[in-house]
Amino acid sequence: MTQSTDPQGEKGLWGARFASGPATAMAALSKSTHFDFRLARYDLAGSRAHARVLHAAGLLDDDVLTALLAGLDALEADVVSGAFVPAEEDEDVHSALERALVERVGADVGGRLRAGRSRNDQIATLLRMFLRDHARVVAGLVLDVVEALLTQAAAHPGAAMPGRTHLQHAQPVLLGHHLMAHAWPLLRDVERLRDWDARAAVSPYGSGALAGSSLGLDPVAVARELGFTRSVENSIDGTASRDVAAEFAFVAAMIGVDLSRISEEVIAWATKEFSFVTLDDAWSTGSSIMPQKKNPDVAELARGKAGRLIGDLTGLLATLKGLPLAYNRDLQEDKEPVFDAVDTLEVLLPAVAGMVATLHFHTDRMASLAPQGFALATDIAEWLVRRGVPFRDAHRISGACVRRCEERAIAEGRGVELWDLTVEDLAAISPHLAPAVRDVLSTEGSLSSRDGIGGTAPVRVAEQLEAAQDALAAHLAWARP
């Protein structure tokens, strides 16, 4: 069995009790620098804060602290410039950076930084720092999609379209009302990120491997320097829990689902059969064999990536479900799912925002279909209710009107809608159906009548747009201060 040429006792962080280094295959399995080195700057920030609390506890003198901070600053410059990258034998981001620091300031100085901390509390803290930063980035990008939806809604204040349930015509609604039905879930996703951030703003630093530290260090000072609001109450919980990562993965998956629902509609709307929208050339692709094709690839990729984001969440939850306290090496698998979720959203969201912002809506086509498919049947029922007819009877009478339309359509060989019913047709169905019922059989009348809070009446949609714009501004102040 081949063994590593780098015994951990010489260059790593843990090898003194071992007679030899790990097997080559073991080292390859254990290695994580290929994905966790993106945490390097957070690791260095944590090391600066840790050096200061070691100094405050009397464990570092002034000269050593100065040398450590200078070495960490120089190392960060090399990380940022690319002059420093992990070596093949480096196990993880922590060991890579400690090796580099020791090379710069010497073992006597660099080796003192390890006191009072473990990779267990380090990585738990760094992951929170990374996710908190990227939560704001993701939130800002989600809000770009919201802004695109609201801009389209504002640009089409009176445009009507078919509202659907079960994908069948249901009732007319305003296009703006429909678009904002996608905006509100995305605004809630940003609320979830903000709520999540309050829970993530608790620092595990100082928890050590699991039991805390006996060196008189000040975890609160580290937490404050790293942008946290406080330290964890329980050191075992601090090192062993990953609900913060799982919750972030859930919000990411929920964002993916919400984008997928928008995208599914765009895909349908762009078909010849619907002809509700034309996609902008910049957000479409073509075919290698069919010259006429204009494909909604942004929307299709959004649908596909929603599944990927759900997979990130379920994979992480499956990793966590059977772990006893405290830290277990399984937790090395916590990072790639959330890294992937971040990377996926940060490339997907700008494309969805661009697609939505440049959609060209064919409002005449949408308006012509808004009342079709007997979509005004509920208006007949509610007209009857306003005249004292019990809704059970009103529902039956309105349904009979639909059936009469279908009977005439078969007999006449053409489409017959509710407004095509004659006075005689209506009277034959029910004496309650006076000729005045025809006054409600219009898209405009139907829309205007839905004037309860949250309804699709133009006045309510205008109020809703203002409220959504206010929410957008408030969230942007958090995401992009």
Swiss-Prot record:
Pathway: Amino-acid biosynthesis; L-arginine biosynthesis; L-arginine from L-ornithine and carbamoyl phosphate: step 3/3. Gene3D superfamilies: Fumarase/aspartase (C-terminal domain), Fumarase/aspartase (Central domain), Fumarase/aspartase (N-terminal domain). Its EC number is 4.3.2.1. CDD domains: Argininosuccinate_lyase. GO terms for cellular component: cytosol. The keyword Transcription regulation does not apply. Its main location: cytoplasm. It comes from the Bacteria. Belongs to the lyase 1 family. Argininosuccinate lyase subfamily. Disulfide bonds: none annotated. Keywords: Amino-acid biosynthesis, Arginine biosynthesis, Cytoplasm, Lyase. This is Argininosuccinate lyase. The keyword Cell inner membrane does not apply. One of its GO terms (molecular function) is argininosuccinate lyase activity. It is found in: Cytoplasm. It catalyses: 2-(N(omega)-L-arginino)succinate = fumarate + L-arginine. InterPro entries: Arg_succ_lyase_C, Argininosuccinate_lyase, Fumarase/histidase_N, Fumarate_lyase_CS, Fumarate_lyase_fam, Fumarate_lyase_N, L-Aspartase-like. Pfam families: ASL_C2, Lyase_1. GO terms for biological process: arginine biosynthetic process via ornithine; L-arginine biosynthetic process.
